[in-house]
Amino acid sequence: MTKSLDRTPLTRDFFDRDVLEVAPDLLGRTLVRREPAGTIELRLTEVEAYAGEVDPGSHAFRGRTARNSTMFGPPGHTYVYFTYGMWHCLNLVCGPDGHASGVLLRAGEIAVGAHLARDRRVSARNDKELAKGPARLATALDVDRALNGSDLFGGPAPALSVLHGTPPPRDLVRSGPRTGVGGDGAHQPWRFWIDGDPTVSPYRAHAPRRRPSRKAT
C-alpha cells in the first residue's frame, strides 16, 4: 500500500445510503477484524451490491426469514450466511432500517496480520490469494455465523469495523454482472472492483446446479 492510509473509522451515515452508492465507495476502505489472536486489516478490492426485496439476486427478495433477518435491521451491521454446506460469506448491511440491502465483500488485500490469515488459508499459493473470493475472505478473517448481526460501531473495539482507508481513483473502479447470479438478477452491473488489482477474484457466470445422475440398477 503506497498511499497514506486514513485510519478514521467510517460513520453509520456512510452505510445509511443507497446500496449502489455504498458498494463502490467501499473499495479501498480498510476492513478491520479484531480477535483474541490478533488483528487483521484488509483493503477491500471487490464487492457486490444486493438491493433487498426489489432485487431477484438478493436473499431478501422473497421477504424476511430467520436466515436473512439481519438484512432488515439498521445499517452498519453484518450479515453472515453459510453456503454450500461449508463456506461463510460476509456482507455489510446498508440503506434505511428495514430496507434489507447489503454489500457482499468479495475480495481484498491483507495488509496487517497476514500470518493469521495464512494459518487459516493453508492452500493459498501466495498472499494475494488469501482473501481472493468471498469464502476465502471470510475464512482468512475467521468470520462465521457467530458474527452475524455484529454492529460495526459496537463499542471502542468491535470485532469488525471499517476505516476510511485509501479509495482508488474513480477511473480504476469497474463494474459488471455479479458472480454466480442467474435469472432476472443476472445482468445488473452491481459487482464493483479495482481494475488490475491481483487480489480480485475471477468472474464466473451463473451455472445451474445439476443433480447427480442415477445409475441404472
Curated annotation (Swiss-Prot):
One of its GO terms (molecular function) is DNA binding. Residues 197-217 are annotated as: Disordered. Residues 206-217 have a biased composition (Basic residues). It is an enzyme of class 3 (hydrolase). Keywords: DNA damage, DNA repair, Hydrolase. Signal peptide: none annotated. Disulfide bonds: none annotated. The keyword Hydrolase applies. One of its GO terms (biological process) is base-excision repair. PANTHER family: DNA-3-METHYLADENINE GLYCOSYLASE. Belongs to the DNA glycosylase MPG family. This is Putative 3-methyladenine DNA glycosylase. It comes from Streptomyces griseus subsp. griseus (strain JCM 4626 / CBS 651.72 / NBRC 13350 / KCC S-0626 / ISP 5235).
